[in-house]
């Protein structure tokens, strides 16, 4: 496994990541030739200088096309000429210390089956399968029959939620709380990005929501993909023309990690309207894995909400759906939610959903398990409440459209409370 970057407290300079130069994605700026016009226009591509960009939309054929949205609503000024897009690499790695690369030994070639059998004369290749001999007596299907299936085996086949096992519930929560700190993206990473903005990231996440709905992916897959994107951008500078490629590779990795039947690579190439080739997607997947040091089991807001729902007595499906809706709303905007841990965002989403539907407050049982009091939830709760109030006017509407479905009890149509008693 490649070595990981360890960041110190001070901000250090950027080092170029050396990759194959056939796509001219990671070339020395002094040797970089003018980029050729791609066959299909990239999603977040803009002018050569970072600044107010024209309205863009993500490209896809299967997912419904997005409305033209401004991708740079932030106040930026034209930078010096050396920051021109055509004069800088597509990816730049931010390191605080020199990385130590570890080379893996070359893999031995596998021995062919025929060669292996040649060393053992007692082993022979299987011949044609003979049909089974029919039974000479009728099978007894009564309960006393030895052929009858034990009903206890049938009962054991029911799926079990590991979070509901009391013996492990506390250990699981403690482990997730430790890992969420290790897998947390840097809060101010967008300030170090020379060519992308928070609004571009919001467009990308909104598009990934549509991709997840198109392929019926789990909500956890979406949360993981956004975590991978933020952690990748915390260490790498990316040009806007490659931002969708990063998001596509992150969604591919999250699907492989979480889904039973993940979509094929060709499917992800297809939804980008062939803006990127299969080779580019696979190379980016490899790069994301290296930057993340193969740490893919990141705790998410969705995971903590699943634990918190166990304290909901009696169970309330509308509260659960609304909490999931609020948790996904926090994915759209990097500011201010990157400064909060997933467990804290999940607590604020759970309390706000519970208060909206039932008028109840943060349960005492959750306060004991998590250590979060209503007072400690207040900063995140206030931000999430404002996001909830402004959701109908937000530029990105895929999450609201998703939760209008009866599957989620149409919770995005509920009126948020005007005030909170905290």
Swiss-Prot record:
GO annotation, biological process: animal organ regeneration; cell cycle G1/S phase transition; cell division; cellular response to cocaine; cellular response to estradiol stimulus; cellular response to hypoxia; cellular response to insulin-like growth factor stimulus; cellular response to leptin stimulus
Annotated segments matching region Disordered: 1-62
Subcellular location: Nucleus; Cytoplasm
Entry's transmembrane regions: none
Keyword Cytoplasm assigned: yes
Alphabetical list of InterPro entries matching this protein: Cyclin, Cyclin-A_N, Cyclin-like_dom, Cyclin-like_sf, Cyclin_A/B-like, Cyclin_C-dom, Cyclin_N, Cyclins_cyclin-box
Modified residue annotations for N-acetylmethionine: 1
Record GO terms (molecular function): cyclin-dependent protein serine/threonine kinase regulator activity; protein domain specific binding; protein kinase binding
Processing after translation: Polyubiquitinated via 'Lys-11'-linked ubiquitin by the anaphase-promoting complex (APC/C), leading to its degradation by the proteasome. Deubiquitinated and stabilized by USP37 enables entry into S phase. Ubiquitinated during the G1 phase by the SCF(FBXO31) complex, leading to its proteasomal degradation.
Keyword vocabulary terms for this entry: Acetylation, Cell cycle, Cell division, Cyclin, Cytoplasm, Mitosis, Nucleus, Phosphoprotein, Ubl conjugation
CDD domains for this protein: CYCLIN_CCNA2_rpt1 (cd20561), CYCLIN_CCNA2_rpt2 (cd20564)
Positions bearing Phosphoserine: 5
UniProt note on tissues of expression: Ubiquitous. In the testis, expressed in germ cells and in the ovary, in both germline and somatic cells.
GO cellular component, one term: nucleoplasm
Highest taxon, organism lineage: Eukaryota
Cross-referenced Pfam families: Cyclin_C, Cyclin_N, Cyclin_N2
Family under the similarity heading: Belongs to the cyclin family. Cyclin AB subfamily.
Primary role: Cyclin which controls both the G1/S and the G2/M transition phases of the cell cycle. Functions through the formation of specific serine/threonine kinase holoenzyme complexes with the cyclin-dependent protein kinases CDK1 and CDK2. The cyclin subunit confers the substrate specificity of these complexes and differentially interacts with and activates CDK1 and CDK2 throughout the cell cycle.
Subunit structure: Interacts with the CDK1 and CDK2 protein kinases to form serine/threonine kinase holoenzyme complexes. Interacts with CDK1 (hyperphosphorylated form in G1 and underphosphorylated forms in S and G2). Interacts with CDK2; the interaction increases from G1 to G2. Interacts (associated with CDK2 but not with CDK1) with SCAPER; regulates the activity of CCNA2/CDK2 by transiently maintaining CCNA2 in the cytoplasm. Forms a ternary complex with CDK2 and CDKN1B; CDKN1B inhibits the kinase activity of CDK2 through conformational rearrangements. Interacts with INCA1.
Protein name as catalogued: Cyclin-A2
């Amino acid at each position: 496994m490649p070595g990981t970057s360890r960041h110190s407290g001070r901000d250090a300079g950027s080092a170029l990541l050396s990759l194959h130069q056939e796509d001219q994605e990671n070339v020395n700026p002094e040797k970089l030739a003018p980029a050729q016009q791609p066959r299909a226009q990239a999603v977040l591509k803009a002018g050569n200088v970072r600044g107010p960009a024209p309205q863009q939309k993500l490209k896809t054929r299967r997912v419904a096309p997005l409305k033209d949205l401004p991708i740079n609503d932030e106040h930026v000024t034209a930078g010096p000429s050396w920051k021109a897009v055509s004069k800088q690499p597509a990816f730049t790695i931010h390191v605080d210390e020199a990385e130590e690369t570890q080379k893996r030994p070359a893999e031995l070639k596998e021995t062919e089956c025929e060669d292996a059998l040649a060393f053992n004369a007692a082993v022979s290749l299987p011949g044609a399968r003979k049909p089974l001999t029919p039974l000479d007596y009728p099978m007894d299907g009564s309960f006393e029959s030895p052929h009858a299936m034990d009903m206890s085996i049938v009962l054991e086949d029911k799926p079990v939620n590991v979070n509901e096992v009391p013996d492990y519930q506390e250990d699981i929560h403690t482990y997730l709380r430790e890992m969420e700190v290790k897998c947390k993206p840097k809060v101010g990473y967008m300030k170090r990005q020379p060519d992308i903005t928070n609004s571009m990231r919001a467009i990308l996440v909104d598009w990934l929501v549509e991709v997840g709905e198109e392929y019926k992916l789990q909500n956890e897959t979406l949360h993981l993909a956004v975590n991978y994107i933020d952690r990748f951008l915390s260490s790498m500078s990316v040009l806007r023309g490659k931002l969708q490629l990063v998001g596509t590779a992150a969604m591919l990795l999250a699907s492989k990690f979480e889904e039973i039947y993940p979509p094929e690579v060709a499917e992800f190439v297809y939804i980008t309207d062939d803006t990127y080739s299969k080779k580019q997607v696979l190379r980016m997947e490899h790069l994301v894995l290296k930057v993340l040091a193969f740490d893919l089991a990141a705790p998410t807001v969705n995971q903590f909400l699943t634990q918190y729902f166990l304290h909901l007595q009696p169970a309330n499906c509308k509260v659960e759906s609304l909490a999931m809706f609020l948790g996904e709303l926090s994915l759209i905007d990097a500011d201010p939610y990157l400064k909060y841990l997933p467990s804290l965002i999940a607590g604020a989403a759970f309390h706000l959903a519970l208060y909206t539907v039932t008028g109840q407050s943060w349960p005492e049982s959750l306060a004991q398990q998590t250590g979060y009091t209503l007072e400690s939830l207040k900063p995140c709760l206030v931000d999430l409440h404002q996001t909830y109030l402004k959701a109908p006017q937000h530029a990105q509407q895929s999450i609201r459209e998703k939760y209008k479905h009866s599957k989620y009890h149409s919770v995005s149509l509920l009126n948020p409370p005007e005030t909170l008693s905290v």
